[in-house]
Design a protein with these regions (language model features):
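Long, charged N-terminal interaction/targeting segments
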Residues: 1-81
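Cys/His-clustered metal-coordination modules, chiefly Zn-binding fingers
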Residues: 69-99
Length: 99
């Protein structure tokens, strides 16, 4: 699935003015697709954007949770996993460049 396909699939959860997933790394898209199945069950869940900044992911979302520390923990966990996948993808790219 591409980022565009992902964004179309989850369009009901991406508010106007936001763009959702902003890059194409297949492993990241597959991971997010699985995670989104749970996230969309959270009351008030909105996906704002997922972007790379200095080769580190930023995962922006919002929920109706009163305890925003829960959002911060969830964000930390998701960003950590995506960063791992991004790093693996960039290492594969380097290997292909030198072989």
């Amino acid at each position: 699935m591409t980022a565009n396909e992902f964004n179309e699939k989850y369009k009901p959860y991406i508010p106007e003015g936001w763009y959702g997933l902003g890059f194409d790394i297949l492993e990241v898209t597959n991971y997010l697709d699985k995670v989104m199945e749970d996230l969309i069950m959270i009351p008030g869940f909105e996906l704002h954007q997922v972007k790379l900044k200095f080769n580190m992911v930023r995962f922006y979302f919002e929920t109706n949770w009163k305890d925003k520390s829960l959002e911060a923990e969830l964000q930390y966990k998701i960003e950590g996993q995506i960063n791992k996948l991004v790093k693996e993808d960039s290492e594969v790219g380097k290997d292909e460049m030198f072989n």
